[in-house]
């Protein structure tokens, strides 16, 4: 059994979000030795326990107060929320923040040789899915009646197996759909990973640890979205150079020895279109442009 004074975090044991969740916690400075067969791991340097479970169990563990935090895909969270509401429950939790990984979309797909004239093409059809509540909400809003075929895996084979006329499943690249003779025709839900917290009173020590963890997560995500830039820039065009680089703060300007026409500029920027930006900087007279990744960041 885990100590109740320790912060309990549920994450996916294996699958789409597992590696990214582990990396996020590691970058936040949480030292955890995760063994393949061990479902509970204790952090070495913080009062934190990691529960490694199936992803569709995580929302319930948080909503039922079994764990304090959960890292989960929004698609799984929303499906469980709709499921509990359909059963007359009032599930409670807090979404602390959206994370920067686990992006996917829940889409409708039909056989490539069938005509598609919009969602009405599915009226009266049988649709295979692992997300019956999300599918029902979407098609109910469109006024479309359908028959649901619930599958917990290999949804994409349902049309060829004669189990369904279409599917509603997660899509990342679309390669799996194509391999099974299907095409994506409608996106019904877009999802990323998120961090959720249980409802109810939290011990002060746990809440302080959660606040610290949130600050570190913000720093990790901000660092991944930013770059550290160094360059030599002409003094008469500094404003134009700065305008090209949206930054967290104003840049640091340093004189260059023996050069009155240029200065050294250091800054953190959230700019992502960097080849095009570097070409524009060079056209303004900038030189020795270095773009470096940032491991950690705190404003």
UniProtKB/Swiss-Prot annotation:
Pathway in which the depicted protein is active: Amino-acid biosynthesis; L-histidine biosynthesis; L-histidine from 5-phospho-alpha-D-ribose 1-diphosphate: step 1/9
Cofactor: Mg(2+)
Keywords from the named record: Amino-acid biosynthesis, ATP-binding, Cytoplasm, Glycosyltransferase, Histidine biosynthesis, Magnesium, Metal-binding, Nucleotide-binding, Transferase
Top EC class, one word: transferase
Record keyword Metal-binding present: yes
Reactions catalysed: 1-(5-phospho-beta-D-ribosyl)-ATP + diphosphate = 5-phospho-alpha-D-ribose 1-diphosphate + ATP
MF terms in GO: ATP binding; ATP phosphoribosyltransferase activity; magnesium ion binding
Regulation: Feedback inhibited by histidine. Also inhibited by AMP and PR-ATP.
Annotated protein name in UniProt: ATP phosphoribosyltransferase
Gene3D superfamilies in UniProt: 3.30.70.120, Periplasmic binding protein-like II
UniProt cross-references to InterPro entries, sorted A to Z: ATP-PRT_HisG_long (IPR020621), ATP_PRibTrfase_cat (IPR013820), ATP_PRibTrfase_CS (IPR018198), ATP_PRibTrfase_HisG (IPR001348), HisG_C (IPR013115), N-reg_PII-like_a/b (IPR011322), N-reg_PII/ATP_PRibTrfase_C (IPR015867)
EC number: 2.4.2.17
Subunit structure: Equilibrium between an active dimeric form, an inactive hexameric form and higher aggregates. Interconversion between the various forms is largely reversible and is influenced by the natural substrates and inhibitors of the enzyme.
Highest taxon in the source lineage: Bacteria
Location of this chain's protein in the cell: Cytoplasm
Organism name: Escherichia coli (strain K12)
PANTHER family membership: ATP PHOSPHORIBOSYLTRANSFERASE (PTHR21403:SF8), ATP PHOSPHORIBOSYLTRANSFERASE ATP-PRTASE (PTHR21403)
Keyword Amino-acid biosynthesis attached: yes
Pfam families with a match to the protein in the record: HisG, HisG_C
Family statement drawn from the similarity comment of this UniProt entry: Belongs to the ATP phosphoribosyltransferase family. Long subfamily.
Gene Ontology terms: cellular component: cytosol
GO term, biological process aspect, one: L-histidine biosynthetic process
Function as written in the Swiss-Prot or TrEMBL entry: Catalyzes the condensation of ATP and 5-phosphoribose 1-diphosphate to form N'-(5'-phosphoribosyl)-ATP (PR-ATP). Has a crucial role in the pathway because the rate of histidine biosynthesis seems to be controlled primarily by regulation of HisG enzymatic activity.
